[in-house]
């Protein structure tokens, strides 16, 4: 996705992402609505669905396939594997043409069209220009001066999410190392390997964390359960009733919180693989007050916000 995105941007081509799980009908709608003539696909199912659409399409001309293990349909005479696609440029002698295109690029150029799920009817194509990204980066530079090239961001959401796409672009702008999790089912294994300092995510991820932690607490001994619950309540009082309100906490509460933060909370975050976490933006859907309160209580650095796709958020 990132390869093709930046390759497209460099040639003033509009990038239009789709979900890997899109049905042939959904693919066909987007192809026709946006008049897409070239489509990049991943594994076998994506190829099969895309080729089914191409056979009936007057618009879609070529599929470019990332996965070399994909078997082409015997009727397919136009598709090409990604590595072979790259080699087409070896003798294209297109450097001058590309330089001219890049020099003519403008912030007013359309960068991408994001087809959101919507609540009714067909997907809506949200048109985003390069100035949308530039403005997002400008304001993030002001609001998030702590993000730097020492950070590692876990790219967990699909890059069809403008939330993840804009965040990943911002991280690249700041020199942040990007770790891409390709299989959502592997995130519990990936996080302890990567130890991200940054990660944007949707509430559903943190809801699963909340449920998992409370299942562990409820299955522990009465003594340990009492310790965990006291730690969470201490964190709630310190962070929500004092720190977040700009009020100096009583000495005893501050000392108790520091103890739990260095023991219970640090152990919890190490198990999850997020002990180095500095900033975890959360958006895309409502985050329940219960989960939000829990995350802040155990000192997980979430920042909860909202925005429209039209605002690059």
Task: List each model region and its residues.
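Conserved AMP-binding
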Residues: 19, 156-161, 284-286
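Conserved AMP-binding/adenylation subdomain of ANL enzymes
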Residues: 134-155, 159-265, 276, 301
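Short hydrophobic/charged patches on amphipathic alpha-helices used for structural packing
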Residues: 27-28, 99-102, 188, 269
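Structural core segment of the AMP-binding/adenylate-forming
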Residues: 10-88
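A short helix-loop-beta submotif of the ANL/AMP-binding
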Residues: 1-16, 20-24, 32-38, 151-152, ...
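Conserved A3 ("GATE") glycine/threonine-rich loop of ANL adenylate-forming enzymes
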Residues: 204, 283-291, 304-313
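Conserved pre-ATP/AMP-binding loop-to-beta segment of ANL
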Residues: 80, 92-115, 122, 146-152
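Adenylate-forming
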Residues: 44-59, 206-222, 262-275, 289, ...
């Amino acid at each position: 996705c990132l390869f093709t995105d930046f390759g497209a941007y460099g040639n003033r081509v509009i990038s239009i992402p789709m979900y890997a799980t899109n049905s042939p009908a959904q693919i066909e709608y987007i192809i026709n609505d946006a008049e897409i003539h070239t489509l990049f696909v991943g594994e076998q199912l994506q190829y099969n669905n895309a080729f089914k659409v191409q056979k009936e399409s007057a618009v879609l001309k070529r599929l470019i396939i990332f996965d070399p293990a994909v078997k082409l349909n015997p009727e397919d005479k136009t598709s090409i594997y990604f590595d072979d696609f790259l080699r087409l440029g070896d003798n294209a002698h297109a450097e001058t043409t590309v330089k001219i295109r890049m020099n003519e690029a403008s912030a007013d150029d359309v960068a991408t069209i994001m087809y959101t799920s919507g609540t009714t009817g067909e997907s809506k194509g949200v048109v985003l220009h390069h100035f949308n990204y530039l403005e997002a980066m400008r304001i993030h530079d002001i609001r998030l001066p702590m993000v730097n090239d020492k950070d590692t961001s876990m790219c967990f959401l699909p890059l069809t999410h403008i939330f993840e796409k804009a965040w990943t672009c911002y991280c690249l702008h700041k020199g942040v190392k990007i770790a891409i999790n390709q299989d959502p089912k592997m995130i519990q294994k990936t996080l302890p390997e990567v130890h991200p300092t940054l990660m944007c995510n949707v509430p559903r991820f943190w809801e699963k964390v909340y449920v998992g932690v409370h299942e562990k607490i409820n299955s522990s001994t009465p003594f340990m359960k009492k310790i965990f619950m006291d730690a969470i309540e201490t964190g709630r009082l310190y962070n929500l009733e004092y720190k977040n309100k700009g009020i100096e906490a009583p000495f005893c509460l501050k000392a108790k919180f520091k103890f739990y933060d260095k023991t219970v909370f640090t152990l919890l975050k190490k198990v999850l693989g997020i002990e180095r976490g500095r900033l975890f933006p959360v958006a895309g859907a409502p985050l329940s007050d219960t989960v939000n309160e829990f995350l802040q209580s155990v000192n997980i650095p979430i920042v909860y916000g909202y925005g429209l796709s039209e605002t690059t958020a």
